Every structure is written in structure tokens, then in C-alpha cells.
Amino acid sequence: MLLRFTKMHGLGNDFMVLDLVSQHAHILPKHAKQWGDRHTGIGFDQLLLVEAPNNPDVDFRYRIFNSDGSEVEQCGNGARCFARFVLDKRLTAKKQIRVETKSGIIELDIRSDGQISVDMGPPRFVPEEIPFEAAEQATRYNVEVDGQNIELAAVSMGNPHAVLRVDDINNAPVHELGPKIEHHPRFPARVNVGFLHVVDRQRAQLRVWERGAGETQACGTGACAAAVAAISQGWMDSPLLIDLPGGRLSIEWAGPGHSVMMTGPAVRVYEGQVRL
């Protein structure tokens, strides 16, 4: 059968989006891996599935597969594209949408200026909830990599993140340390790794090595995790701007127990069909 899909991106973090509300198909990890190949497939960072909800209190179910076929809990840039997609496809007329994900419910707000705000929910710091192996909860941890102690923050935004502060974003060891920390045994579910350079109290630069995808142009949950880490450690104040290789996100967080709000664009690139 032929499936209609839409190619989208949020700050260069690119997605294949499938409507499984009006189309009926069983998508497997092997399909994500096959379609995700940039040489022999469609090519994307993540595959986003729009499904009917299991929960009557939400509008849609949102599933995410990395291009390596692994299913993940959350994707912030994808959430903005999800909101733009369901509105453009007339799957809803609502400008405020509640969506269930593998890690819980998120709320999406399509603003009049075309930007999309996502209530990502409160961050989690308890090591078992990230998950991260540590004797006790702390603001910063030392993790040994190749005999060196690497200082990082660990936080969950529905998916696990490690945040490292760097002095030079252009020369940050993203491709050297990223995969080693991603697969570090203290992160049993693997981890997304953010390299953060604080410019001033309202602006920072960020590069992210994404679990299962490598370095991407942008990572919404990574930007949220980096902002939370920077605010928690007194480096920055809310609201703040995070500049990623693909563009800028605005992040707000009022502190522990409060939700993280992320605002940024979502762009449709093209429509296509793929054989299942």
C-alpha cells in the first residue's frame, strides 16, 4: 500500500510525519530504519506518527522513532511540527492541543504569529527517573570517560539528557564525547548529550548529540534540558534564548515543580508517498 507522508523540520531537525488517523497501517522499527536512510530512503532525524488517542482527555497520540529504528519518549522540535501538521491537515481546528506521548501528556499552543509553544511539563532530576546511575541526586555529577572526569548535569525532559558546559561551541567535542556519553553505562537507556556555551544570562549556544541520531541541527528537549541546567546552577535567568545550529528557541522555566515552555517554528517542506 501507498502511505501519504509530509516532510517537515523544526530549525533543521527534520522529520517524516505520518497521519495514522485517516490512514491505517502498522509501522515497525524496521520501516523507520529503512525510510530514515539519507542515501536509500527518505532521510530524517525522526519519524513522527500521528495516531488516535487511547486517552479520552487528549486529542492525539504522538509516537517517535529515531532513524536507527529505536522508539523514543519525547521530541520537542517534533512536537511543534506535530501541532502544525494536525492543523494543516485539518485533523483538528483547535489552536491548543493536548497530546499523549510515551512519557506523558504535553500541551501545544499554535500562536497567531505562526510560532508554536509547547508545554513540555516539569523536568525530572531524580536519577532513577532520568534514568542515571548515581548514589544521590545532585546538580552536577562527575562521569568517567576514557580515564577523564567529565562534569555534567543530568535531567529528564521525558527523555534523558546530559548537559556539559563548554567555553567554545565551535570546538566542542561533540563527535568525540557525544557517542561515548550516549552509551555510558551510567545511562542505562542511553542519553542525549548537550554541549552548552553560556554567552550571557539571557542567551546561550548549544550543540546536541542525539541518542540514536548523532548530531542534529536542533533538539527541542535538549534546549529545554540545557536551559533547566543553566538556570538550576545559577548561570542564566528565565526567559532565555538558546541558539542551535538550525536556529533559535525561546525557553521559560520558573523553577522546580514548574513546566518548561518552549517556543519556536515548524515548517512543512514537501508532501510525498511511500510504499509500505
Curated annotation (Swiss-Prot):
Entry's Gene Ontology cellular component terms: cytosol
Pathway(s) annotated for this protein in UniProt: Amino-acid biosynthesis; L-lysine biosynthesis via DAP pathway; DL-2,6-diaminopimelate from LL-2,6-diaminopimelate: step 1/1
Any Gene Ontology biological process: lysine biosynthetic process via diaminopimelate
Enzyme's top EC category: isomerase
Localization: Cytoplasm
Gene3D superfamilies: Diaminopimelate Epimerase, Chain A, domain 1 (3.10.310.10)
Transmembrane segments: none
Coiled coil (UniProt feature): none
Key words of the record: Amino-acid biosynthesis, Cytoplasm, Isomerase, Lysine biosynthesis
Residues at the site labelled Important for dimerization: Y270
Main location: cytoplasm
Residue positions of the active site: C75 (proton donor), C219 (proton acceptor)
The protein's Enzyme Commission number: 5.1.1.7
Record field: catalytic activity: (2S,6S)-2,6-diaminopimelate = meso-2,6-diaminopimelate
InterPro entries: DAP_epimerase_AS (IPR018510), DAP_epimerase_DapF (IPR001653)
Function: Catalyzes the stereoinversion of LL-2,6-diaminopimelate (L,L-DAP) to meso-diaminopimelate (meso-DAP), a precursor of L-lysine and an essential component of the bacterial peptidoglycan.
Protein family per UniProt: Belongs to the diaminopimelate epimerase family.
NCBIfam families: DapF (TIGR00652)
Subunit and interaction comment: Homodimer.
Name assigned to this protein: Diaminopimelate epimerase
Organism listed in the record: Pseudomonas savastanoi pv. phaseolicola (strain 1448A / Race 6) (Pseudomonas syringae pv. phaseolicola (strain 1448A / Race 6))
Name of the coding gene: dapF
